[in-house]
UniProtKB/Swiss-Prot annotation:
Stated family: Belongs to the disease resistance NB-LRR family. RPP8/HRT subfamily.
Repeat (LRR) residue spans along the chain: 575-599, 600-623, 842-867
Keywords: ATP-binding, Coiled coil, Leucine-rich repeat, Nucleotide-binding, Plant defense, Repeat
Record carries keyword Cell cycle: no
UniProt lineage: Eukaryota, Viridiplantae, Streptophyta, Embryophyta, Tracheophyta
Species of the source: Arabidopsis thaliana (Mouse-ear cress)
Domain of life where this protein originates: Eukaryota
Location of the NB-ARC domain: 146-459
Protein's UniProt keywords contain Acetylation: no
Name listed for the protein in its UniProt record: Probable disease resistance RPP8-like protein 4
């Protein structure tokens, strides 16, 4: 494994030497010596890795080599960047630059000679162990091959909810009965070991039709081993009252009575997933009243937790799969479309498969991991190698004894070891995140890119391809929403995360810092070899200022529940080689981002999302290698952004502050590599800056009253690769006379469109992109019903009308309209009184939300014809709505076919 990581580092080093050959002139002799040693090194690595598991010395050699490769890259890149910074104008600058250049060149030559000698010494020691030259041979897929496989994956990867449902059907029905029909039990507990399927079972119960009809509100909170009381209470309250914007500002003393009172007055179902200890319940329980009405479904590895929470608790013991069920689940993963095709499995492969699943101990997680491993093997010899690899190291059975647990761990580890090197890198990066984290995939993709785990396609395409590979192998869980093929979030099962942490420790991949007294969650024998830090506690920042961490490449803040303060600029002084710096939600003393940030010249990723910052230093101009920059800070006053972003020519992602002061003027026209640009403002930049940004996929633009709409249209016309566009006009702009110029039909790739544009009526359907899938209209003040136009956009999957998008009295959804619509939301339409839905309209609708439409008299009668509808949310509507739509109400016939009808804040 380490060989793969070293080879990956060597590839990056060779790329750097090739790319910067012109700037490296003058040290040719030293570079030639380095290259000779690197070639010798590459020929030894494969055999070294084969001997690694049997020799601590070989393992240490590989770690030494990895350090040497990193050091060489740091030395060369630092020299190139310093040379680049010195390329100024003027005689005095030229003299100073020449003197500094000669000094730097002498130093880099000396440093390279030092690295070369260290590599030579390591090679000599490795050769003394008899390691023979073996060709390093793992081939990566080409970009074209990956795109082809990506299309196949999108077509064949099974929906997780379907593939999970093996051997649990009877258990689901039993649990639903206890929750819905039996008032004796207020707490129902699902107990069992990790990986046995407790969460899968709870999820099926949570979404069951009878459960969704029975309760008024629902909350799902994953507690896990490390939680904060405030976070758990906030999550419950947020799910029960999602539109209360004050919840995140509440402390425990405010949350406790509010949540207690809410649970006393309603019929709610709460799921507490993964509660580890009785003491955890004791910390949480103060918000739960004894009064019956609400119910709780609790999952835990400890059967005693549920009984401790409620002595009358019904404890349900999750059972392992029998051999037949295990093989059925494995088949669904390996052959996701076998039921639809004539695929016939070789008898020998089937026999091996059935034998291999016995080593999974009946645990669904292990079965799915094995299925993901076998899905990439298509011949008898390949399956035999997997079988031999499992069988030679474990003796398993169909019951959960120690041997079975060892076999499960081995299968999960095999799934990792079977990954190609580039996927191992990506998988181990998930070790940064705390247990049970929902990881935002866009951030993850940009982390990968910042560390060089990125190819010639766009960051989004590259990231999606590799994440889909990990999901397909059942190493990662992703939320594949039916409205989109894209994954927005991903997470890991806790047993798989343990494998990830174990492998990350083995590879010295990162160090997790929780607090000043506990800094070794993943700590190598030599802490200095950890080049990545993940901060899980706000108390840990001072460690960075006082420890010497000159080789750290990645620093990610991964906990948001507590305050993170940076009170000293010195925190950056010892981190000069950072590539990744995520300071999301961090608070800076005095609101100032230290000017020392400009010394982090190697940075590729910088996030200040939600950080308390009121001042950005001009030294940021030195961050010329940035690929990702998020400046969406939490500023109460408009922030000044210095005009230095124009020098960050490598940027792929840029999110600007929502509010910038009047003095801010940004020249962004040279940022031609941008793929994502958000909060671009024509008040602070010229709309013509967009002309050359032809690689843009996602654009959010705010247009001022001084904007020339003809120029806007011509600039946007060049952005033919756009997939998402949000246009926000200042409220004072009257757009009635201009919307006709705003033609969007040439955006052939545009899938998502958001418009906050004043217009008397919606444009004709021919002005919209041909494949538009999602549209959100806000504050449009349309007087004419938009539905007759929108329903003719044949590819629409979701429509949202919000806060004055329409100010008329009546809307009509006609027969045959919206043929593919899955989700519809109508919010804050204060003048809407009547909504007509004709039979045959919206035949695929699955989710409907009605929110705060005070004059709307009733739900349309035509909803009874939409048999596809699975979820109806009624939020902040009059009490009469709820009274008419509950069983026995006069309008119940309209919604009785809908499995999940929720009333949220409708008791006023």
């Amino acid at each position: 494994m380490a060989e793969g990581f070293v080879s990956f580092g060597l590839e990056k080093l060779w790329d750097l030497l090739s790319r910067e050959s012109e700037r490296l002139q003058g040290i040719d002799e030293q570079l030639d010596g380095l290259k000779r040693q690197l070639r010798s090194l590459q020929s030894l690595l494969k055999d070294a890795d084969a001997k690694k598991h049997g020799s601590d010395r070989v393992r240490n050699f590989l770690e030494d080599v990895k350090d040497l490769v990193f050091d060489a890259e740091d030395i060369i890149e630092s020299y190139v960047l310093n040379k680049l910074r010195g390329e100024g104008k003027g005689v005095k600058k030229h003299v100073r630059r020449l003197a500094r250049f000669l000094t730097d060149r002498h130093k880099v030559a000396s440093d390279i000679e030092g690295i070369t000698k260290r590599i030579s010494d390591v090679i000599g020691e490795m050769q003394s162990f008899g390691i023979q030259q073996i060709i390093d041979g793992v081939r990566s897929l080409s970009l074209q091959e990956r795109q082809r496989v990506q299309r196949e994956i999108r077509q064949t990867y099974p929906d997780s909810s379907e593939s999970d449902l093996v051997g649990v059907e009877q258990s689901v029905e039993e649990l639903v009965g206890h929750l819905v029909e039996n008032d004796i039990y207020q707490v129902v507990s699902i107990a069992g070991m990790g990986g046995i399927g407790k969460t899968t079972l709870a999820r099926q119960v949570f979404h069951h039709d009878l459960v969704r009809r029975h309760f008024d509100g629902f909350a799902w909170v994953c507690v896990s081993q490390q939680f904060t009381l405030k976070h758990v209470w906030q999550r419950i309250l947020q799910e029960l009252q999602p539109h209360d914007g004050n919840i995140l500002q509440m402390d425990e003393s405010a949350l406790q009575p509010k949540l207690f009172q809410l649970l006393e007055t309603g019929r709610y179902l709460l799921v507490l997933d993964d509660v580890w200890k009785k003491e955890d319940w004791d910390r949480i329980k103060a918000v739960f009243p004894r009064k019956r009405g609400w119910k709780m479904l609790l999952t835990s590895r400890n059967e005693g937790v549920g009984i401790h929470a409620d002595p009358t608790c019904l404890t349900f013991r999750a059972s392992i799969l029998n051999p037949e069920e295990s093989w059925k689940l494995c088949e669904r993963i390996v052959f996701p479309r076998r039921d639809e095709t004539e695929v016939r499995l070789d008898e020998e492969m089937e026999a091996m498969g059935k034998e291999m699943v016995t080593h999974c101990g009946g645990l669904p997680l292990a079965v799915k991991a094995l299925g993901g491993l076998l899905a990439n093997k298509h011949t008898v010899p390949e399956w035999k190698r997997v079988s031999d690899n499992i069988g030679s190291q474990i003796v398993g059975g169909s019951c959960l004894d120690d041997n079975s647990l060892n076999s499960v761990n081995r299968i999960l580890s095999l799934s990792y070891e079977d990954l190609p090197t580039h996927l191992k890198h990506r998988f181990l990066y998930l070790a940064h995140f705390p247990e049970d984290s929902k990881i935002y995939t866009q951030d993850l993709f940009n982390y990968w890119a910042a560390e060089g785990i990125y190819d010639g396609s766009t960051i989004q395409d590259s990231g999606e391809y590799y994440l889909e590979e990990l999901v397909r192998r059942n190493l990662v869980i992703a939320d594949n929403r039916y409205l989109s093929l894209e994954f927005n979030f991903c997470q890991m099962h806790d047993m798989m995360r343990e494998v990830c942490l174990s492998k990350a420790k083995e590879e010295n991949f990162l160090q997790i810092i929780k607090d000043p007294t506990s800094t070794s969650t993943i700590n190598a024998q030599s802490p200095s070899r950890s080049r990545r830090f993940s901060i899980h506690s706000g108390k840990a920042f001072h460690i960075l200022g006082h420890r010497n961490n000159p080789k750290v490449r990645s620093l990610i803040v991964s906990r948001f529940e507590e305050d993170f303060w940076i009170r000293s600029a010195s925190v950056f002084h010892n981190l000069t080689l950072l590539r990744v710096l995520d300071l999301s939600r961090v608070k800076f003393e005095g609101g100032k981002l230290p000017s020392s940030i400009g010394g982090l010249i190697h940075l590729r990723y910088l996030s200040l999302y939600g950080a308390v910052v009121s001042h950005l230093p001009s030294t940021m101009r030195n961050l010329k290698l940035l690929l990702f920059l998020n400046l969406r800070v939490d500023n109460k006053e408009p922030i000044h952004v210095p005009n230095v972003l124009k020098e960050m020519l490598e940027l792929r992602y840029l999110s600007l502050p929502q509010e910038m002061d009047d003095k801010t003027k940004l020249e962004l026209g040279d940022l031609v590599n941008l793929e994502y640009l958000w909060y671009f403002s024509t008040q602070h930049s010229s709309v013509t800056d967009l002309l050359r940004m032809t690689k843009l996929r996602n654009l959010g633009v705010s247009l001022s009253e001084r904007c020339n709409f003809e120029t806007l249209s011509s600039s946007l016309r060049e952005l033919r690769n756009l997939e998402m566009l949000n246009v926000l006009f200042s409220p004072e702009i009257v757009m009635v006379d201009h919307m006709g110029e705003f033609v969007l039909d040439h955006f052939i790739h545009l899938k998502q469109l958001g418009l906050a544009v004043r217009m008397s009526k919606i444009p004709d359907q021919h002005q919209f992109p041909p494949h538009l899938a999602h549209i959100h209209l806000v504050h449009c003040v349309m007087k004419e019903d938009p539905m007759p136009i929108l329903e003719k956009l044949l590819h629409l999957k979701s429509v949202a009308l919000s806060y004055g998008a329409f100010i008329g009295r009546r809307v009509v959804c006609s027969k045959g309209g919206f043929p593919q619509l899955c989700a519809l939301g109508i919010s804050g339409e204060s003048e809407l009184e009547e909504w007509i839905v004709e039979e045959g309209s919206m035949p695929c609708l699955r989710t409907l939300t009605i929110h705060d439409c005070e004059k709307l008299k009733e739900l349309p009668d035509g909803l009874k014809y939409i048999t596809s509808l699975k979820e109806l949310k009624i939020r902040e509507m009059k009490r009469e709505w709820k009274e008419k739509l509950v069983p026995g109400g006069e309008d119940y016939y309209k919604v009785q076919h809908i499995p999940d009808v929720q009333f949220i804040n409708c008791d006023l």
